[in-house]
C-alpha cells in the first residue's frame, strides 16, 4: 500500500505534510525535498528575468524584496531599478547590473598599462582608466640596478627621477582597497617604465584576458595589451626576445654548440635583467629605431583601431591576422578610413569562421 504525500506552502516555504521520512544519512528526505522545492520556487519566481537580460536606466529589474541590491541598481518603493544600461547579473541573492560600456573595474592579477598622474608621499597615483586612480607604493617598485633593499629617505626624495607625471608604465594589480581602487606593483622586470613606442587606447571590454599580455609580433614589434584597454606598441628589446627562448625558464645559462663545434654560453635571463635594470627609469628613447620600425608600429596601431571599430575582441592572433590583411594597403593612413576598417574586420571574422573557431 502506498502513501500519498501532499505538499502545502506556508509563509513562502514549502513543507511536507506527511510524517514519513527515511533517515539514512541523518537528514530526512522530507527536509531535502523541502529545500529543493524552495530553491525551485525562488528560481521560478525570477524565471521571467533572464540573467542575460539587457536593461536600461530606470527600468524595473524586480519587485521581489528577496534580492539584495548590488552595483548598477537602486531601490525605490520596495522595487529594484537599474541605474545603468547593461546586463542583469545574479550571484546567490545579490542582484547587480553590469554596464555594457563603462570605466575599467580592476581585479587582482590584472596586467595594466597606466600613466603617472601624481607623485605623493611614498606613492604614485596612476591613471588606469578606472573610476579612481590606482596607487603604486615606493616599496612596490624595483630600484635601479636590481638591488633588493629597504627604501630609504633618499629614495623618497628621488621619486621623480624614477617616475614623474606623464610617464607611462605597465604594472600588475596587487590588491584592491575597500573603496575599489587598485594597488599596483612593478617588482618584475617585465613591468616598469615604457619607452621606444606608441600608446593607443581601446574599450577595456574588448581586451580578451589571457595568461600573458605581452607578445612579440612580426616586424620586430612587441605589444603590451593592458586589461584596462591601454595598449603599448614598442620595438622588441633583448628582454622581450629572452622571454621567448628556453633559457628564459632557467636561472642558469644554457650551453649550445656553434657551427665550428665550439661550446658557447647564451646569456641567462638573470644577467639580462641585471643589465637592463640600470636603464628601466631612463627618459631617453633608442635613437637607432629605423623608419621601418616606426611605420610597423603605426600600422599595428591602426589595425588595432580597426578591430576596436568593428568591436572585435583583441588578441595576439587577431592583431597578427589584421596586420597581414593590411599589407595590401601601402599607405598606413588608409587603415583608419571607415570602409577599410570594416573590410579588415570582415576579413578577420571570415577567416575565423573558415577555421571553425569564430565567436
From Swiss-Prot:
It holds the Pfam family KH_6. SUPFAM superfamilies: Eukaryotic type KH-domain (KH-domain type I), Nucleic acid-binding proteins, Ribosomal L27 protein-like. It comes from Saccharomyces cerevisiae (strain ATCC 204508 / S288c) (Baker's yeast). The keyword tRNA-binding does not apply. Residues 242-266 are annotated as: Disordered. Belongs to the RRP4 family. Residues 107-187 form the S1 motif domain. The keyword Metal-binding does not apply. Non-catalytic component of the RNA exosome complex which has 3'->5' exoribonuclease activity and participates in a multitude of cellular RNA processing and degradation events. In the nucleus, the RNA exosome complex is involved in proper maturation of stable RNA species such as rRNA, snRNA and snoRNA, in the elimination of RNA processing by-products and non-coding 'pervasive' transcripts, such as antisense RNA species and cryptic unstable transcripts (CUTs), and of mRNAs with processing defects, thereby limiting or excluding their export to the cytoplasm. Changing residue 136 to P: In RRP4-1; temperature-sensitive(ts) lethal mutation. Keywords: Acetylation, Cytoplasm, Exosome, Nucleus, Phosphoprotein, RNA-binding, rRNA processing. One of its GO terms (molecular function) is RNA binding. Component of the RNA exosome complex. Specifically part of the catalytically inactive RNA exosome core complex (Exo-9) which may associate with the catalytic subunits RRP6 and DIS3 in cytoplasmic- and nuclear-specific RNA exosome complex forms. Exo-9 is formed by a hexameric base ring of RNase PH domain-containing subunits and a cap ring consisting of CSL4, RRP4 and RRP40. Interacts with LRP1/RRP47. This is Exosome complex component RRP4. Gene3D superfamilies: 2.40.50.100, Nucleic acid-binding proteins. One of its GO terms (cellular component) is exosome (RNase complex). Present with 4840 molecules/cell in log phase SD medium. The modification Phosphoserine is found at residues 28, 268. GO terms for biological process: CUT catabolic process; exonucleolytic trimming to generate mature 3'-end of 5.8S rRNA from tricistronic rRNA transcript (SSU-rRNA, 5.8S rRNA, LSU-rRNA); nuclear mRNA surveillance; nuclear polyadenylation-dependent rRNA catabolic process; nuclear-transcribed mRNA catabolic process; poly(A)-dependent snoRNA 3'-end processing; RNA catabolic process; RNA processing.
Amino acid at each position: 500500500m502506498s502513501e500519498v504525500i501532499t505538499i502545502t506552502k506556508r509563509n513562502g516555504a514549502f513543507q511536507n505534510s506527511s510524517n514519513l521520512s527515511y533517515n539514512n544519512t541523518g537528514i530526512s528526505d522530507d527536509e531535502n525535498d523541502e529545500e529543493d522545492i524552495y530553491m525551485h520556487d525562488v528560481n521560478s519566481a525570477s524565471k521571467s528575468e533572464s540573467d542575460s537580460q539587457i536593461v536600461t536606466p530606470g527600468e524595473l529589474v524586480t519587485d521581489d524584496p528577496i534580492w539584495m541590491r548590488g552595483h548598477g541598481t537602486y531601490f525605490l518603493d520596495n522595487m529594484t531599478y537599474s541605474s545603468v544600461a547593461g546586463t542583469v547579473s545574479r550571484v546567490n541573492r545579490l542582484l547587480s547590473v553590469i554596464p555594457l560600456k563603462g570605466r575599467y573595474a580592476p581585479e587582482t592579477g590584472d596586467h595594466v598599462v597606466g600613466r603617472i598622474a601624481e607623485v605623493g608621499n611614498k606613492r604614485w597615483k596612476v591613471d588606469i582608466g578606472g573610476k579612481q586612480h590606482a596607487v603604486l607604493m615606493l616599496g612596490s617598485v624595483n630600484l635601479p640596478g636590481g638591488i633588493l633593499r629597504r627604501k630609504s629617505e633618499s629614495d623618497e626624495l628621488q621619486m621623480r627621477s624614477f617616475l614623474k607625471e606623464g610617464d607611462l608604465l605597465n604594472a600588475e594589480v596587487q590588491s584592491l582597497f575597500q573603496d575599489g581602487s587598485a594597488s599596483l606593483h612593478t617588482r618584475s622586470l617585465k613591468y616598469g617604465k615604457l619607452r621606444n613606442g606608441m600608446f593607443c587606447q581601446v574599450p577595456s571590454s574588448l581586451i580578451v584576458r589571457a595568461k600573458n599580455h605581452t607578445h612579440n609580433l612580426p616586424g620586430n614589434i612587441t605589444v603590451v595589451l593592458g586589461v584596462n584597454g591601454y595598449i603599448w606598441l614598442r620595438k622588441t628589446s633583448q628582454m622581450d626576445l629572452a622571454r621567448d627562448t628556453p633559457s628564459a625558464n632557467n636561472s642558469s645559462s644554457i650551453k649550445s654548440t656553434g657551427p665550428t663545434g665550439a661550446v658557447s654560453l647564451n646569456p641567462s635571463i638573470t644577467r639580462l635583467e641585471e643589465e637592463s635594470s640600470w636603464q628601466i627609469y631612463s627618459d631617453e628613447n633608442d635613437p637607432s629605431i629605423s623608419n621601418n620600425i616606426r611605420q610597423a608600429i603605426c600600422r599595428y596601431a591602426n589595425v588595432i583601431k580597426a578591430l576596436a571599430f568593428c568591436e572585435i575582441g583583441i588578441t595576439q592572433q587577431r592583431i597578427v591576422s589584421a596586420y597581414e590583411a593590411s599589407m595590401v594597403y601601402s599607405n598606413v593612413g588608409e587603415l583608419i578610413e571607415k570602409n577599410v576598417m570594416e573590410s579588415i574586420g570582415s576579413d578577420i571574422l571570415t577567416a575565423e569562421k573558415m577555421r571553425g573557431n569564430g565567436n
